[in-house]
Amino acid sequence: MAASVDNRQYGTHINAVVRACGPDFNTPLPSDFDLDSSSDDEDQNDDASFLKELIQKANAETEASLLDPRDEGTADQWIPRNASMVRFTGKHPFNGEGPLPRLMHHGFITPSPLRYVRNHGPVPKIKWDEWTVEVTGLVKRSTHFTMEKLMREFPHREFPATLVCAGNRRKEHNMVKQSIGFNWGAAGGSTSVWRGVPLRHVLKRCGILARMKGAMYVSFEGAEDLPGGGGSKYGTSVKREMAMDPSRDIILAFMQNGEPLAPDHGFPVRMIIPGFIGGRMVKWLKRIVVTEHECDSHYHYKDNRVLPSHVDAELANDEGWWYKPEYIINELNINSVITTPCHEEILPINSWTTQMPYFIRGYAYSGGGRKVTRVEVTLDGGGTWQVCTLDCPEKPNKYGKYWCWCFWSVEVEVLDLLGAREIAVRAWDEALNTQPEKLIWNVMGMMNNCWFRVKTNVCRPHKGEIGIVFEHPTQPGNQSGGWMAKEKHLEKSSESNPTLKKSVSSPFMNTTSKTYTMSEVRRHNNADSAWIIVHGHVYDWTRFLKDHPGGTDRILINAGTDCTEEFEAIHSDKAKQMLEDYRIGELTTTCYNSDSSSSNPSVHGRSDTIPLTPIKEVITPMRSVALIPREKIPCKLISKTSISHDVRLFRFGLPSDGLLMGLAVGKHIFLCVTVDEKLCMRAYTPTSSVHEVGYFDLVVKVYFKGVHPKFPNGGIMSQHLDSLPIGSVLDVKGPLGHIEYTGRGNFLVHGKPRFATRLAMLAGGTGITPIYQVVQAILKDPEDCTEMHVVYANRTEDDILLKEELDEWAKKYDRLKVWYVIQESIREGWEYSVGFITESILTEHIPNASPDTLALTCGPPPMIQFAVQPNLEKLGYDTQNNLLVF
């Protein structure tokens, strides 16, 4: 590059064009400030001019951010975002990274809209003029600083710094073994120019106390209300000596790339701690507290740790590993990534390409201010290494520290690539730290910095022409693709198939495996042919439809789609092993066609053209029901009522007030939320009538942590629902279920008609809700004469859901009989059964077995297996044909 980027202190910011947002960012500094700079004015002006040029170039080449339809109905629907961002956690909260080729196209400075985003909850909606930052704790003068006061009364520093999430490259971890984090790719880092006021100046102004008086840590707290730990703010801390160290360049930043911070990046003010992981740089900064101990936030202890490989989440909770200080992450480690060749790039092998060198390129960074001093590439698995050329635009600060990534490149012969099985890269820093050859797994999937490997395979892109196709280890988020995903599943199959074992070790494409395009898979979306995609593999589940314990709908609602995230969210390890029996091939993407265009998209690291996803016109058909099979719909929490200490009635609004839900009687829905960075899906049956317009109701029992010894963490979904504020939005998917009541004694079971004049309805715990729904539908139709006999089992009286409604209906309608069974009575005067469901209870309270009698049941599997089914059989019920299990 023509110049280097310096790390200096400036009196006015480097970019004269600032978007209008209220404050004046060109405020001159008081003349008595020590600018703490060792450079002369000429050098300073040259550096500022160069930074301005880089920022203007980055901003000019980025399309405008827009309101994203994926945010509609969420608390973030007011925030413009770049449409190319790869999202990790569904609709909300927003977490994502920019496409890696686009980051490399922009180079040293990343446009703010393409910088990675890590949010734990909704983005606070903040006004500049109303915002204050409190500094308190072990200081002589606790103070609230307005934004204007911060800007006017302290010196400003402006410098470039690379921020990286500690989870960068985590998806590689998740391919080895699932961590508790979502799937970061290799674009979880980027460089911006940050402007703010030094933290040490603010702390000095407030009179920070000495270490001997207990001032050991400086904690930072954000503004957002989060569910973690039963409800908390995002907070973390650093040691006092770090906070006060002038060489660390720690600032309270209010500008990024010459503009005010974007909402996703912490507007109006955030922490910037160069050389540290992004998790220490609190956004929407609200409080700074000087303390004797580390920050006590849930997120300080339960995030950003590297625990030993044998420690899983359960062991970490049981033995307190989260609280051991030696495992906390602060400074970044050394890391490097190959960006050219990009994933699925094809290099044709012909007389022209073989006469020119191929340039392999990428980025590298280290932490703690350590300079990257060497990057090496190997084509033979580490036998020999080629030293790369480094492009380091940054100058060190006055203390010799480097805060930014650098770029590297090396030229290789194309014929050498043709004979290589893979390309791997490793970097070194000035402390002679380097990257390990193999991945070291940890439960949070943090700090992955093993050699970055790109596999090479021979392909025939067009008319017999030979080419090399390059494959990165993973693709970010829930995108399919990457050699690690393929090898993970091939290795499972190879245990019983020696042919597959051989193909895993081959440097060439596995041509024995059938491949399918996405368009081919989409056509198999019905009961006659139900295909799904999981981790890039195609499975035909048609023959499993009738055996699926959750009913055919749970497969059909995802048929013809990539359902990786949902499959992982709701299936056990046993189910994942069963999946292999149904694998029929791999998902492929359409290769480059050398005759289709005059442009060459592949060859020598060209980055002058970045293909963007075409904009398609979407015409939304008018509809009267909310639920759309295979799609998630956003629903807003309208009200929440506490029925008891652990039972809640939730009312959710449908996307439009005039819509019916579109859920048949007997069917259920999935609620989809993201909790602790993982998708959580649970099935619920609404208690509201299917005829209600604009909303639906759920009665939910909240399973709190620490109550039941077998489930010390409680219920993930129920606790999350209980923590939601009014106005929160979650996703709903459905309808699901194999049983549908169509009225007047008629059912459809797996699509086949059934009829009954009498129903034995056996429920346990929260399994009452589908029974309740059928009862409600029958009673609403005065011409439906179906007899209903409900036996409802619970632990105690307090656990009985919907008792008032059931009792009222039983008094009003002769065709409904209700009987309760509880394990133990906690009050005198209980007039129903105590114990478990027995033959004698059923003999007395349900109808005799007959051809026109059906038994319906829903509840815990042990209840159905050991109480309901055997006792019905004793009474002569044909449980194979006349017992319907929701």
Curated annotation (Swiss-Prot):
Entry-linked SMART domains: Cyt-b5 (SM01117)
A GO biological-process term: nitric oxide biosynthetic process
Gene3D superfamilies found in the cross-reference section: 2.60.40.650, Cytochrome b5-like heme/steroid binding domain, Nucleotide-binding domain of ferredoxin-NADP reductase (FNR) module, Oxidoreductase, molybdopterin-binding domain, Translation factors
Pfam families: Cyt-b5, FAD_binding_6, Mo-co_dimer, NAD_binding_1, Oxidored_molyb
Cofactor note: Binds 1 FAD. Binds 1 heme group. The heme group is called cytochrome b-557.
Entries under PROSITE patterns matching the protein: CYTOCHROME_B5_1, CYTOCHROME_B5_2, FAD_FR, MOLYBDOPTERIN_EUK
Listed cofactors: FAD; heme; Mo-molybdopterin
Binding sites annotated in the UniProt record for Mo-molybdopterin: C165
Binding site for heme: H548, H571
Binding site for FAD: 682-685, 699-704, 711, 716-718, 769
Molecular function, one GO term: heme binding
Residue stretches making up the FAD-binding FR-type domain: 630-742
Keyword terms, alphabetized: Disulfide bond, FAD, Flavoprotein, Heme, Iron, Metal-binding, Molybdenum, NAD, Nitrate assimilation, Oxidoreductase
Reactions the enzyme catalyzes: nitrite + NAD(+) + H2O = nitrate + NADH + H(+)
Domain of life according to the entry: Eukaryota
Enzyme class of the recorded protein, top EC level: oxidoreductase
Family per record: Belongs to the nitrate reductase family.
Self-association and partners: Homodimer.
Described purpose of this protein according to its UniProt entry: Nitrate reductase is a key enzyme involved in the first step of nitrate assimilation in plants, fungi and bacteria.
Protein's UniProt name: Inducible nitrate reductase [NADH] 1
Organism of derivation: Glycine max
The gene coding this protein: INR1
